[in-house]
Amino acid sequence: MARTVNCVYLNKEADGLDFQLYPGDLGKRIFDNISKEAWGLWQKKQTMLINEKKLNMMNVDDRKFLEEQMTSFLFEGKEVEIEGFVPEKDQD
């Protein structure tokens, strides 16, 4: 049976992550409150941020910036702003 969480991002019950993917207290908070679906959405945004802003994950400042963006996206509902990115329109 899949583990479910009350996902803060999606605002609904959904399948939870299989294990803690991020270290520390923030990782525990993500594990307890974020669904697989929401984490997948974040991973897409994270990849775009890393590529567009040319972030270096060996750089402490870049990692801190990415963590701030992740917290804002997952827990505060703030959209990640990526310069020049225009989301595709839904086609009926």
From Swiss-Prot:
GO molecular function, one term: iron ion binding
Keywords for the protein's UniProt record, in alphabetical order: Iron
Disulfide partners: none
Transmembrane segments: none
Function: Could be a mediator in iron transactions between iron acquisition and iron-requiring processes, such as synthesis and/or repair of Fe-S clusters in biosynthetic enzymes.
Protein family per UniProt: Belongs to the Fe(2+)-trafficking protein family.
Name listed for the protein in its UniProt record: Probable Fe(2+)-trafficking protein
Species of provenance: Shewanella baltica (strain OS155 / ATCC BAA-1091)
